[in-house]
């Protein structure tokens, strides 16, 4: 399997002017040669877009913090939600429940790795990205508690 290194929605170019679905998209800006190369890293990065809404947060101009509340406009996309579900179903079918769990854990790691950069370079909006990290961590915890990653649970849903 080829490793991209920065597989985000923004790095997938879709074309509507071609009939062959295999040629309707291509990937740009590879970042190969990382110390840790794994398709799980790539899929985790993709989920940072589809699940965590990273690109939508990048377009959100401001957030406010009052006591223990972080307020910002949380943008969701039905198309992203559908793609997120399709990627999770596809990866779960190919990698098993433990593989899907690992991919979602890698998404969380991408959010964790992002925080020092946001705290240094984007201090005013860093709380919003922290909130994104917490939302993803909460989802992962909920799915673990619901048994989403148990092999039998995934098999029963098919």
Predicted regions and their residues:
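Active-site acidic catalytic loop and adjacent metal/ATP-binding pocket
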Residues: 1-39
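Residue-identity detector for glycine
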Residues: 5, 17, 33, 44, ...
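Intrinsically disordered or highly flexible coil/loop and linker segments, enriched in small
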Residues: 12-13, 56, 146
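Composition- and surface-driven signal marking solvent-exposed, interaction-prone regions
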Residues: 19, 62, 127-130
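Active-site activation/catalytic loop segments of kinase-like enzymes and analogous catalytic loops
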Residues: 25, 31-91, 108-123
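ATP/Mg2+ or Mg2+-diphosphate-binding catalytic cores
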Residues: 77-158
